[in-house]
Amino acid sequence: MDSQQSDLFDTASQPDTVADEYTFLEFNTQGDSEFDYQDFGSPTAWPTPSDSISIADVADRGEGGAAADHHSEASSPSSLSAGAGNGAKVGRGGVGGSGGVSSSSQVDALAAGVGNLNFEETGDDDGFDYGKNDFTEHACKYCGISNPACVVRCNVASCRKWFCNSRGNTSGSHIVNHLVRAKHKEVCLHRDSPLGETILECYNCGCRNVFLLGFISAKTDSVVVLLCRDPCLNVNALKDMNWDLSQWCPLIDDRCFLPWLVKVPSEQEQLRARQISAQQINKIEELWKTNPDATLEDLEKPGVDDEPQPVQPKYEDAYQYQNVFAPLIKLEADYDKMMKESQSKENLTVRWDIGLNKKRVAYFVFPKEENELRLVPGDELRLRYSGDAVHPSWQSVGHVIKLTAQEEVALELRANQGVPIDVNHGFSVDFVWKSTSFDRMQGAMKNFAVDETSVSGYIYHQLLGHEVEAQMVRNTLPRRFGVPGLPELNASQVNAVKSVLQKPISLIQGPPGTGKTVTSAAIVYHMAKQGQGQVLVCAPSNVAVDQLAEKISATGLKVVRLCAKSREAVSSPVEYLTLHYQVRHLDTSEKSELHKLQQLKDEQGELSSSDEKKYKNLKRATEREITQSADVICCTCVGAADLRLSNFRFRQVLIDESTQATEPECLIPLVLGVKQVVLVGDHCQLGPVIMCKKAARAGLAQSLFERLVTLGIKPIRLQVQYRMHPALSEFPSNSFYEGTLQNGVTIIERQTTGIDFPWPVPNRPMFFYVQLGQEEISASGTSYLNRTEAANVEKLVTAFLKSGVVPSQIGVITPYEGQRAYIVNYMARNGSLRQQLYKEIEVASVDSFQGREKDYIILSCVRSNEHQGIGFLNDPRRLNVALTRARYGIVILGNPKVLSKQPLWNGLLTHYKEHECLVEGPLNNLKQSMVQFQKPRKIYNDRRLFYGGGAGMIGNDNFGSGNPNADRRGSRGRAGGSYLPSGPPNGARPGLHPAGYPIPRVPLSPFPGGPPSQPYAIPTRGPVGAVPHAPQPGNHGFGAGRGTSVGGHLPHQQATQHNVGTIGPSLNFPLDSPNSQPSPGGPLSQPGYGSQAFRDGFSMGGISQDFLADDIKSQGSHDPYNMADFATQASPGGFAVDYATQGAHGAFPGNFMNQNSQGGYSRFSGINDFMSQEYMAHGGQGLFTQAGFIDSSQDDGQQNPYGVNNPNLQSQGLPNSLYSQPFAHYNTQPLNLSGPQQSQPNQSSQNPKHPYNG
């Protein structure tokens, strides 16, 4: 390409990141190519074939090549001469065939001539509608460009549409956009293109997957060859020929085909083309799935691709709730059905076996890398055989009972008859889609709306976001909170158990390694001992349910683990607790008859109709007998709607890992009569997986836990982590948990003896291994891989194994499925030790490793490019999960030049650099890297996390709506606004933590003179044991009973942020007037807050700028990365949210979602099930005061409105042993005292919060 064309290409190819919302499929291959390792030497940029280069003909392959040609209607490339990448002329025969060798000037002249002919100005045509009607058959279906040298045909038989190599307004070329979205992989060049009508395919094996194809230049001759990455490049298919395999380069670079292969349209052509946005591309591609002949004009028809109503923070009633969520569940169900039914595999090789239950089991390999869907045990598949001369056609449905690390699937068949066990080849497999889980979600929402007994009135209103008086469950607390069979609880765990037992609805936030499961088991134990009936324990995944069931069983409670029938054959660590196991091993008189019938059924495969009826009745009676005798029933959230529990009612429900479940999924166990619910999870880690992007954009990916947090229900945070080496927990604690995580393990406990691994800093078992290799698109087209990182992962694994670490201690994790599959194959091929050792190493995606841990973690980041960003590595929750899986040590491989552009990653890299753990070079001679970091970009909200929000143009100090759930997709700011890239999900936004998590709207007192919030004016929903309360005069709304409300002076001591360790400098300023409070429209939007605030809320030493300043003045210093400098943000409702910069050194941990410092409870009296409860005045401190509310209708004695005889009961500022600061000075005024704070003149006319009697 000449310099002029290069300039035009650069100008026309800038990605419109505002428009491109298809963020998951970011698959750029542009980037730094400075390979420091001999495995994959590469020039600085992808080489462009020079003059007189020829592409070898597939028909002229060497002896090692495939014999068969893969010609269809088009020829394979035979010979190519290219003038500096300007184009090529293909001969139809041997080298220099009929076309001969054409010069670059001829090609340029031809291209210029075509351009002049097609795009001449016509005076009355403004160019906007060019290509609207696709004048030629080969015009790009997106933009209408029809230059033969610039267009490519999708060669899938059902498609055969043409697309150009122009980006237009998207971040990738139109042809690559189409291939990815449609999941197509074959292309053919135009017959009038310089290369002729050519199907791109591998020279050696004929593979036509363009995402696998690259080219190699010969060492001596001016010839290039197309070769696929896997298997031909990886197995060195051309080792006996004169090819330099180290110079292999992919055909798709920076989301475009290489310009010497498919020209990029000129700037003039692109300006005259139809302008199409990424959103329009997404919509037309979706439409083509059902109507292949649809055009862009069809998108404008009413009812086409309407966005569903987004999830709300609050709902008027359960019917509105159902009307919002039901369409989203249907969208997800339809997408799941379409995806599963479209996934099929042909020509499988099957090996046969017989299971312990005498059923046939088929084993076959089902590669994960090529599939968007992940198989899990219990999935239904249909195995088919088309038949041959000897065997008839056959098919049978079965359940997946096992998945191996080598991607082998064990499928247990339902029927044993007619199975072709003497055949091993030529099988096909399809998914069998079942709607059970989606049907149960819809049913739960219906019950929630129509059945008043489905949940208590209080929980009903809390779930809908209505403001009701806080209540307290009347329970006798145990003398001690320790539980037999479990480890001794620490102070924050005891605090969580104590608080949960007395509240109708509770949230427990468990950061990594803090003992969520142990705490949950302790809560369940105490609930069961209260004698209020059986406790239902759920989680979204079977693994989480099994872990919790095992812990609860260890306490001595009788536990039944209810499995889906499709999973009864799946091996489980708690097999002895499962219902089907207990049915088989129950020793009763009826059992003997049931056992005989079961044995008969296993042997014969079926029973007579009378025996079958008798068998089912006996089995059903036995199951009911076992479940009724249990103290605790454990199942998945979806499993709670199992017919075997249809007549059960559960007053108390605990849902573990609730942040990984969708809201309708959480609702299933709640509508079984719940009166007390506990949600356990961590919204700072990854949430539920939603496959349908339209449903995810509307908010289905938001968990119930997150929504309740945004509504002001404060999670109780567990604060002592027992997993990570203290050096490993430092950054996650400071960046994701405000420095509040304390270490329950010492450095000595996390040092291993006899392990000789070359850590750069001996007492810090961590380092960032600098990699500058190129990222590439995976075979699926929807993921990435990085061959350089994969090669060095193998070197690291080998070094760990040689140093004495066993394979089961090592975990390799990566965000991308393409890299996961490549690492598995690479280690199997290239590992220098025994192959079996590498097979035992677990290689997994970051998302699938949530909740897991290993002694040593190797994290491969993959992304390495100049322009395309880092994809969903942007998500701070994914980084949090990745950094917190290791117990003893972690190694991160990545490209700092690319990762440092994102502020959070910049902080991580700075942290590693300051501790001398940023290294490069060979493993046996690591040295500190001097690589220069990029200036971090400003980060804003992302639709993947902020539901209803999106990128756009806003003014520098304009955050738009103060509603955290407001839909701002169409927002555009005033002239002079700053550009918002469609970017990472850790942007600052009202009502959201700067790292991307919802924050509670809770009052920070004292703030006299603020506006009260009004109670939700709705009818009550039946009594739940509450007592009417008289409103307190002079103190109304959300802050009632908690000191003064928002809006007045902020005492100096509450605004001061103290230095804690090396977290960073502090903010130290009083707010002297109400006018200095941040506005509800945008947190930290005032310049006065800017001395240490970075754009996304993360603070780095040395940065001095406005929160919304456009210019980053400096970067990095001796101060580690700190995200705790958030003093006094305002929530959308006008209530201040206090982020205290406190660290992990024993000081009080601040006010963000922290209730672990409850110092104690006052005595209470009363005869009701639920007692009212108020936070103390310093709302963030998490102290509760509880007073006895005595129903005045039953006691005529002299009582004040709160039923408290001794006002001093209200001031319980007990010091907590967890923290070094006593806090007795908070809330020293009794709530019913009419002090000066309560008599603000502007409050006298406000409506008080009405008592709630439902």
From Swiss-Prot:
Q: What class of enzyme is it?
A: hydrolase
Renumbered residue ranges of the record's region C4: 202-232
Region labeled S/TQ motifs-rich, involved in the target transcript degradation steps of nonsense-mediated decay (NMD) — which residues? 1-106, 1013-1254
Is Membrane one of the keywords UniProt gives this record?
A: no
Q: Which residue ranges have biased composition labelled Low complexity?
A: 74-83, 1073-1092, 1236-1248
Q: Which domain of life is it from?
A: Eukaryota
Chief subcellular location equals: cytoplasm
Q: Which residues belong to any copy of the Helicase ATP-binding domain?
A: 497-629
Its Gene Ontology cellular component terms are: cytoplasm; cytosol; P-body; plasmodesma
Residues involved in ATP binding: 493, 513-517, 685, 722, 853
Please give the Gene Ontology molecular function terms for this protein. ATP binding; ATP hydrolysis activity; DNA binding; mRNA binding; RNA helicase activity; zinc ion binding
Binding-site list for Zn(2+) 3: 202, 205, 228, 232
Looking up Pfam families in the UniProt record yields: AAA_11, AAA_12, ResIII, UPF1_1B_dom, UPF1_Zn_bind
Q: Bias category Basic and acidic residues: which stretches? A: 61-73
> Which segments constitute the Upf1 CH-rich domain?
132-291
Bias category Pro residues: which stretches? 1000-1014
E.C. no: 3.6.4.12, 3.6.4.13
Q: From the UniProt entry, list the residue stretches annotated as the region C3H.
A: 140-174
Please note every region of biased composition (Gly residues). 84-100, 1036-1046
Read off the PROSITE patterns from this record: HELICASE_ATP_BIND_1, UPF1_CH_RICH
Name of this chain's protein: Regulator of nonsense transcripts 1 homolog
Q: Which gene is transcribed and translated to give this protein? A: UPF1
